[in-house]
Amino acid sequence: MAEHVRVKGRIIVGLTENIKLISSEGLNEEVVAKVDTGATKSSIDTRLAKKLKLGPVIKSKMIKSAHGNQLRPIIEAEILLAGKKIKTEFSLADRNHMKYKMLIGVNILKEGFLVDPAKK
């Protein structure tokens, strides 16, 4: 993984980042995630979550998306982003038709990250 620069204690990330999903089953997987400052909650593809045996579903929540409002299952999962381990909530969504199987939202970014769109 590339070296991440810090500014005033915050880690600089780009519009896409390599993420390691950490499964309690030991089925960890690295994926490229899209960073989305307009998304309140992070999201994982339903099939990827099932493959890694992530879960259980802790609640359901109404999520606003480009496709309108959707009631989505919410799980708690752990990731490694830029060397920082974070455990937080993710909504499950069908992202199979999308380029990125994971979306990093504000709930993760507020854990000490800044987004630089020019960062490669």
Model regions and ranges:
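Pepsin/retropepsin-fold aspartyl endopeptidases
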Residues: 1-120
